[in-house]
Amino acid sequence: MLTKTNDSRLIDRSSGFDQRTGIYHSLRPSLSLPPIDQPLSAAEFALSLLLKSSPPATAGKNIEALTYLVNSSSGDNLTYGELLRRVRSLAVSLRERFPSLASRNVAFILSPSSLDIPVLYLALMSIGVVVSPANPIGSESEVSHQVEVSEPVIAFATSQTVKKLQSSSLPLGTVLMDSTEFLSWLNRSDSSSVNPFQVQVNQSDPAAILFSSGTTGRVKGVLLTHRNLIASTAVSHQRTLQDPVNYDRVGLFSLPLFHVFGFMMMIRAISLGETLVLLGRFELEAMFKAVEKYKVTGMPVSPPLIVALVKSELTKKYDLRSLRSLGCGGAPLGKDIAERFKQKFPDVDIVQGYGLTESSGPAASTFGPEEMVKYGSVGRISENMEAKIVDPSTGESLPPGKTGELWLRGPVIMKGYVGNEKASAETVDKEGWLKTGDLCYFDSEDFLYIVDRLKELIKYKAYQVPPVELEQILHSNPDVIDAAVVPFPDEDAGEIPMAFIVRKPGSNLNEAQIIDFVAKQVTPYKKVRRVAFINAIPKNPAGKILRRELTKIAVDGNASKL
């Protein structure tokens, strides 16, 4: 059915598609945001939601006594009261110690996840300083490139990571976060009455420079404004308030804090008064132990981790009954795996979602029981968002059921790539549309489906083969723990699909069996035609497969090195 709006657009009530403009509109209720001209930082906004809106986790409780963060390795924790005091203390200390540190200056952060990282993020954002965190295990050349891109005036590191900054000359130098001086800045006795938000921060000001994964080239610095972060936080906050199931939420923080989803999960938890458990180096059994010990109710996962949960015998060893939901993203989740997961964990919901660093995290997700059974879909686009499906060849906007490149527009879309006007213009057009590079389609009910990355399709003769489709089939094999499919150069076909397989321990699965297993389930041009067995599939911190690494390994013939 079509609805005629005041501006004469015709919007289908079921799909949200406007046939005149080619735009898909979110069917979720529009969300009111603070006036754009109101001075407000993302840090102040999140803390105001915690203190003023009485989220479910804080109902009838002393907010300051609630636990915000727990380090699963050491058992150390940080309460919300301590968080507020330390943010105030650090903000004051930084302004006193570095009087020239000004709003819009950039602070580069190179540190493993710890209880102090959220304090540092909030303190810096509250005084208008742009936070730019990077992967602490990155190489010196990678770190040097990120410093060059973000142009910081100051850096925060640890004794273990500071050596990677030796080649970088910063105006205000580098602060060691494990030094006695820094620790003293966190615990000033005179900061209890100080308002850390005295510095005027506009919502249009830059808040963070987060680095893209680099799966399609060298990493870029994604510039997100306070408005971007406020809009993203408002959506997740409102969704949780609408959730009819009210329980104490404890999240397992398996994502690094420098990654956009870890970054946004940190802010979201603050706005809701939730508890986060920091997991150190990721190991499956360590995750199970943490779930059992801290009664974890939810955690972010990638499809390969869902596969591991389905197939692992370790799940019988630990009490995982506290789990209520898993937020799944990073890649499409196959229907077969989702159904097998629900058979094994009938009381755990899979909340599927889609997002990018460039969209400040989630831009679409499932919500509520009816949507969560839409296996294979990443849900509906978020509140206040618009989308297009664009034919890559013609530029034509496509209706439901047709596959093309997903474009997104809304208040969460990045300002651009730092210092890279060309890439910014190529990615976000003059009308504010973000070209995601993902091949997708909407069904007739406004549910979004990810087919594959536009640049990752395998060109077999005149056909295009989506690697994700083959990976989902491979994951359904009981002898396969993990799998990835990449293009392999071929003189006759141009490219052929090559599968990298991680076998179940003790399995004798061979190349011929894999090829036959897939061939029985696909049209001939989609067949896997080459197989290599390896110990682990290389992925980025969000769980996305590093296909370029695998392609290089395949071409070099070095599969045995993994």
Swiss-Prot record:
User: Could you say what a knockout of this gene produces?
Assistant: No obvious phenotype in growth, root and flower development, fertility, reproduction and morphology.
Q: Which residues bind CoA?
A: R281, K461, A462
What does the UniProt keyword field contain?
ATP-binding, Fatty acid biosynthesis, Fatty acid metabolism, Ligase, Lipid biosynthesis, Lipid metabolism, Magnesium, Nucleotide-binding, Oxylipin biosynthesis, Peroxisome
The parts of the chain that form a coiled coil are none
Tissue-level expression reads:
Expressed at low level in leaves.
Q: Name one GO biological process term.
A: oxylipin biosynthetic process
Where are the stretches annotated SBD2? Answer: 353-417
Q: Which GO terms describe its molecular function?
A: ATP binding; decanoate-CoA ligase activity; fatty-acyl-CoA synthase activity
Which reaction(s) are listed as its catalytic activity? Answer: (9S,13S,15Z)-12-oxophyto-10,15-dienoate + ATP + CoA = (10Z,15Z)-12-oxophytodienoyl-CoA + AMP + diphosphate; hexadecanoate + ATP + CoA = hexadecanoyl-CoA + AMP + diphosphate; (9Z)-octadecenoate + ATP + CoA = (9Z)-octadecenoyl-CoA + AMP + diphosphate; octadecanoate + ATP + CoA = octadecanoyl-CoA + AMP + diphosphate
What stretch of residues is annotated with the motif Microbody targeting signal? Answer: 560-562
Tell me which Gene3D superfamilies the record gives: 3.30.300.30, N-terminal domain of ligase-like (3.40.50.12780)
Q: Which cofactor does it need?
A: Mg(2+)
Q: Which family does it belong to?
A: Belongs to the ATP-dependent AMP-binding enzyme family.
Q: What is this protein for, i.e. what is its function?
A: Contributes to jasmonic acid biosynthesis by initiating the beta-oxidative chain shortening of its precursors. Converts 12-oxo-phytodienoic acid (OPDA) into OPDA-CoA. Follows a two-step reaction mechanism, wherein the carboxylate substrate first undergoes adenylation by ATP, followed by a thioesterification in the presence of CoA to yield the final CoA thioester.
Record's protein name: 4-coumarate--CoA ligase-like 9
Give the organism the record lists.
Arabidopsis thaliana
